[in-house]
Design a protein with these regions (language model features):
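Pyridoxal 5′-phosphate
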Residues: 1-404
Length: 404
């Protein structure tokens, strides 16, 4: 049984008030709240096991190393990677994509080679490739979408050429909630001999992800969007790909030997993890994944699907409501505008009612240009949200609308 009240008790922040109103937190697409189990894991490790990992023979260092590497194994199991060598710890999805963009472009691309992305990408899956375009002369090609927010797969197929070296797209749009057909799109790319990077920041918290079933070559996600801490993320890569890519940064831990004449690099995954890792953060990430696993990813997905369907129904009843993104397969994100009310005004006034939503372009300006708007209000749901909170949101939107 999915006991929502018991779940909410694990998140003390949900009991607080904002401007004298109960907090209604609907900004989970930006970051999720943290259960007490995750916060306690952080404090417990600082209080009792704090020591640098991989670098000491003393007991604390060995214990911290065991926790850190056990966390890597937890991530491996959670996304069903073949080996923990395929799990690279990063600061988040953004760094994961930048790591791959740099290493892949350096070793696998030359001027005129192409990367395919989609029109609905977050800036973190556009700008890193533009930096490589400026540095190496690679070409960015863009998958278009229809007005429902669904990628046009026929057009996607036409983008491939003999110069296409990589496809990189969001599993789930952070603006539209569209769940892209990743497995099908990966198969298409592989038919052309092209590897694929999936931005999984918005999918991992909301659905079961199996990187082997997807056959993804690379997959990136962030801890803080799946009830873990900020500052820690993951880049999964097939071992055969990670083996052939050069390091992204240099420093301690990623080396095997160093002289002034030559440096040789460490084995996987450590050659991509220069410097002291966020070993406290990785332990907390593992605790967050354990928390999600205990609730059941499928149970969470069912709960959030019901919430999203209910929210779509309630919001469509509001006069002047425009919802952006009505794909047949949609995750728990709803972006909207009401009448001529500016998204910043709507978000600010909802905040005064205790309702936390996101406003603006959501780091997806090319998508906003495609839709002919400058920004939206975005409500995004998590495992602890309720239908009663959706009712408060709908009532709040109606109240704000009457002010204009």
């Amino acid at each position: 049984m999915y006991d929502i009240q018991k779940i909410r008790e694990d998140f003390p922040i949900l009991d607080r008030e904002v401007y004298g109103k109960p907090l209604i937190y609907l900004d989970n697409g930006a970051t999720t709240q943290k259960p007490r189990q995750v916060v306690e894991a952080i404090t417990d490790e600082y209080y009792s096991v704090n020591a640098n990992v991989h670098r000491g023979v003393h007991f604390l260092s060995q214990q911290a190393t065991e926790l850190h590497e056990a966390s890597r194994e937890t991530v491996r199991r959670f996304i069903n990677a073949r080996s923990s060598n395929e799990i690279v710890f990063t600061r988040g999805t953004t760094e994961s994509i930048n790591l791959l963009a740099s290493s892949f472009a350096d070793s696998q691309m030359k001027e005129g080679d192409e990367v395919i992305v989609s029109v609905m990408e977050h800036h973190s899956n556009i700008v890193p490739w533009q930096l490589q375009a400026a540095r190496k002369g690679i070409v960015l090609k863009v998958i278009p979408m229809n007005d429902r927010g669904e990628l046009l797969l026929d057009e996607y197929e036409k983008l491939f050429s003999e110069r296409t070296k990589l496809v990189s797209f969001a599993h789930v749009s952070n603006v539209l909630g569209t769940v892209n057909p990743a497995k099908e799109m990966i198969a298409t790319a592989h038919a052309h001999g092209v590897p694929v990077l999936i931005d999984g920041a918005q999918s991992v918290p909301h659905m079961k992800v199996d990187v082997q079933d997807l056959d993804a070559d690379f997959f990136a996600f962030s801890g803080h969007k799946i009830y873990g801490p900020t500052g820690v993320g993951v880049l999964y890569g097939k071992e055969e790909w990670l083996d052939k890519l050069p390091p992204y940064q240099g420093g301690g831990e990623m080396i095997q030997s160093v002289s002034f004449e030559k440096t040789t690099f460490n084995e996987l995954p450590f050659k991509f993890e220069a410097g002291t890792p966020d070993y406290i953060g990785t332990t907390a990430l593992a605790k967050a994944l354990d928390y999600v696993s205990a609730l059941g990813v499928e149970n969470i997905a069912t709960h959030e699907h019901e919430l999203t369907q209910y929210a779509m129904q309630r919001l469509k009843e509001i006069d002047g409501m425009r919802i952006f993104g009505e794909a047949g397969n949609k995750s728990s994100v709803i972006s909207f505008l009401v009448g001529n009310i500016h998204h910043l005004d709507m978000g600010t006034l909802l905040d005064r009612l205790g309702i936390a939503v996101r406003t603006g372009h959501h780091c997806a300006q090319p998508l906003m240009i495609r839709m002919g708007i400058e920004g939206t209000v975005r409500a995004s749901f998590g495992l602890y949200n309720t239908k009663e909170e959706i009712d408060v949101l709908a009532a709040g939107i109606e109240r704000v609308s009457r002010m204009f």
